[in-house]
């Protein structure tokens, strides 16, 4: 139980340090999604939904851009989503590694 709390404590500590970067990435994804929505004439919710489905690389395919500029922006949104996911995974690994070393589990 102490191990789990140590991992969570370290995870949220690192998240708090990287919050400006994570917030910037999320706002950039949302903003680019709204831009694509404007180009494609989608409503705001549909554009937001599509941008995060694309950024998280889920890609249901129920909504897709048809214009060339929208497709280009969707590539950028996808890359930003991969960066965001990579940062979260790196933070999780760092927190777990710290907890393993601190508790002496091997």
Enumerate the language-model features and the residues they cover.
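Hydrophobic alpha-helical transmembrane segments of integral membrane proteins
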Residues: 15-32, 81, 85-96
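Membrane interface segments of multi-pass transport proteins and intramembrane proteases
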Residues: 9, 101-106
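Pore domain of cation channels
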Residues: 46, 53-103
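Outer-pore turret/helix-boundary of cation channels
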Residues: 19-50, 65-68
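Membrane-helix boundary elements
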Residues: 1-16
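Membrane-interface helix-boundary signature
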Residues: 12-19, 67-73
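General secondary-structure edge motif
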Residues: 15-16, 28, 35, 56-59, ...
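General structural signal for secondary-structure boundaries
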Residues: 13-17, 43, 103
């Amino acid at each position: 139980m102490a191990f789990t709390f140590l991992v969570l404590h370290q995870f949220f500590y690192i998240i708090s340090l990287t919050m400006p970067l994570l917030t910037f990435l999320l706002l950039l994804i949302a903003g680019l999604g709204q831009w694509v929505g404007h180009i494609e004439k989608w409503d705001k919710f549909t554009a937001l939904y599509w941008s995060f489905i694309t950024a998280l690389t889920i890609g249901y395919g129920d909504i897709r851009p048809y214009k060339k500029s929208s497709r280009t922006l969707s590539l950028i949104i996808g890359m930003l989503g991969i960066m965001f996911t990579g940062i979260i995974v790196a933070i999780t690994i760092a927190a777990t590694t710290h907890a393993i070393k601190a508790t002496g589990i091997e």
